[in-house]
Amino acid sequence: MSFPKRLYQKIVSSSWQLGFIRDGLEGVLSDGFFSVNWVKSPYKDRWFADPFILDVTEDNIYLLVEEFRYKYPKGRIAKLTIDRQSFEIIDLKIILEEDTHLSFPNILRRDGKIYVYPENANGGKLNLYEYDEANEKLVFVQTICDDVIWDSCITELFGKKQMFTAHR
């Protein structure tokens, strides 16, 4: 990647930052104002976006996120461990990398298993992966959709499974 393009990416991309609303949804809905605990990242060569909560313990918050390094301009899916007191990232593991850009690692929990279906619009399809907790990686299960779609959300509505997505 050329220097001007890298510089542009760094300037534009550096504005992404993860945060947690302190007052929860009730505080936001009651008065419309909220304060944020911003996640402190030790990484200056990348940013994180599209957070989905994998787990919360007494000490830590575990997120699946899009990780984007300036040096390699494509997203990867990472698992972040965040300290609940300091809101500092204390661990980072890449759990899925493809040849194309990945983002929006939406989580689906079914029958005691955790599935993830990250956006892969550049790859032209939406794949389903099972989260292998022991090895901290995503294992391919099947292709959900052979089309270019963005930010998909699978849910149950009116007694039926539904998928909401964006298409260009």
What is each residue range found by the language model?
Residues M1-A49, L54-L102, L108-R168:
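Beta-rich carbohydrate-recognition and catalytic domains
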